[in-house]
Swiss-Prot record:
Membrane topology: Peripheral membrane protein
Compartments reported by the entry: Cell membrane; Cytoplasm
PANTHER family named in the record: SIGNAL RECOGNITION PARTICLE RECEPTOR SUBUNIT ALPHA
Protein name per its UniProtKB record: Signal recognition particle receptor FtsY
GO cellular component: cytoplasm; plasma membrane
Keyword flag GTP-binding: yes
Naturally occurring in which organism (per UniProt): Mycobacterium leprae (strain TN)
PROSITE patterns assigned: SRP54
Main location, first listed in the record: membrane
Length: 430
């Protein structure tokens, strides 16, 4: 074979080898990229801590649906690119490995830090036990309300004097004129279209009418479940002496006992005892507390509490506000400011108005004024065990247009229960 033919054959062989190497490299890179994308697509997704659930206390928690906000884009026009100013100046001294002095290794033992004491949290008392206590504590209401009405309608055929007496009974029980008229109208209609001969018949009819008046289909869940990027925010408002701070503590106890991380905001900066009381609750139930100095700006404390909740990855932030009379315009404006400032950091999910069930008619004026200043989403009716006028529940819902979500039944840590219209009416009529 001639020398030229050998050279041509060798060149051809080299070209074939090079082509094979290039082709193999391309296939390898494509397969590697494919595997990377496959692993990314099959990786675990971020865990979602939300989702409606009913706590062991019987209180139902839910999540507020918020509109999706587009993520803010960072303007990179003025930022240095990767690698800018990263080169070492040419005149910098050069060091070899032998020039670098390494420190002698020392075994440093850090002192053992004491573990933070985890507060012991007692199990939540089942709601059934609290509802049994409610029935017992409403004995005075039963005598003044349920028995009186049942005695009037057992016969089925009421004259005008009986209807007037029935109306007076409803008004005395604090149902108010609007709810009273609604109940009277429903009773007239039911009596015309049904036969009521026994107390059992009367009880069944009255029970249906009263439950319907309480609008059982209203959403009574507490919107205290976290969002994807920030905790739920609850604002607790009301006048002095209604039990706001105690309600905040009891609600925190329920949330922590069910595995939620809770931050409390002591925005009542006018009364030092309020922050101290909330500190006691926080220590007792295992919540975190954000408080300011006495006389600090309440809106600033509320903002810091929400900021702390976001930074700490909390599930819910509950803000206790100062008690204020509805007649104090300046304090009511301050309440509006608190909500506006907090909203800059995160949306407010719930504004719960705490009302004293024993105040009767005066509470309705409070309801109207607070509803004008902040959008009330629900009511918490405290001291329900101490009133003989259970009809206030009907009137509050009528005046406020939002549901009674929780009721306070006493001073105990578990004396906070979900409001259930059917259970409440049964307690009135037993």
């Amino acid at each position: 074979m001639s020398e030229g033919l050998w050279i041509a054959t060798a060149v051809a062989a080299v070209l074939v080898v090079i082509a094979a190497l290039i082709l193999g490299s391309v296939r390898y890179r494509r397969r590697r990229i494919s595997l990377i994308f496959s692993s990314l697509s099959s990786g675990p997704s971020a865990s979602d801590r939300s989702g409606s659930y009913t706590a062991s206390s019987g209180i139902t928690f839910s999540q507020t649906a918020l509109p999706v906000q587009p993520a803010d884009r960072i303007d990179t026009g003025e930022l240095p690119a990767v690698g800018d100013d990263a080169t070492v100046p040419r005149d910098s001294p050069r060091h070899t490995i032998s020039d670098v002095l390494l420190p002698e290794s020392e075994l440093i033992t850090s002192p053992d830090e004491p573990e933070a004491a985890v507060p012991h949290i007692d199990a939540i008392v089942p709601p059934e036990g609290r509802l049994d206590r409610l029935r017992g504590r409403l004995a005075r209401t039963q005598n003044a309300f349920g028995r009186s009405i049942l005695g009037l309608i057992v016969g089925g055929d009421l004259d005008e004097d009986s209807w007037q007496e029935l109306e007076d009974t409803l008004l005395v029980a604090d149902l108010g004129p609007v709810a009273t008229e609604s109940v009277m109208s429903a009773l007239r209609s039911r009596l015309l279209n049904s036969n009521v001969h026994t107390e059992s018949d009367a009880r069944t009819m009255l029970r249906d009418v009263l439950i319907s008046e309480l609008q059982p289909d209203m959403d009574r869940s507490i919107r205290a479940l976290p969002h994807a990027d920030h905790p739920a925010v609850l604002l607790i408002v009301g006048v002095n002496g209604t039990g706001k701070t105690t309600t905040v503590g009891k609600l925190a106890r329920v949330l922590v006992a069910d595995g939620r991380r809770v931050v409390l905001g002591a925005a009542d900066t006018f009364r030092a005892a309020a922050a101290d009381q909330l500190q006691t609750w926080a220590s007792r139930v295992g919540a975190e507390l954000v408080r300011g100095v006495e006389g600090a700006d309440p809106a600033s404390v509320a903002f810091d509490a929400v900021d702390k909740g976001i930074g700490a990855g909390a599930d819910v932030v509950v803000i206790d506000t100062a008690g204020r009379l509805h007649t104090k315009v300046g304090l009511m404006d301050e309440l509006d400011k608190i909500k506006r400032v907090v909203t800059r950091r995160a949306a407010v999910d719930e504004v719960l108005l705490v009302l004293d069930a024993t105040i009767g008619q005066n509470g309705l004026t409070q309801v109207r004024v607070f509803a004008e200043v902040v959008d009330i989403t629900g009511a918490v009716l405290t001291k329900l065990d101490g009133t003989a006028k259970g009809g206030i529940v009907f009137r509050i819902q009528r005046e406020l247009g939002v549901p009674v979500k929780l009721v306070g039944l006493g001073e105990g840590p578990d004396d906070l229960a979900p409001f259930e219209p059917a259970v409440f009416v049964d307690a009135l009529l037993e």
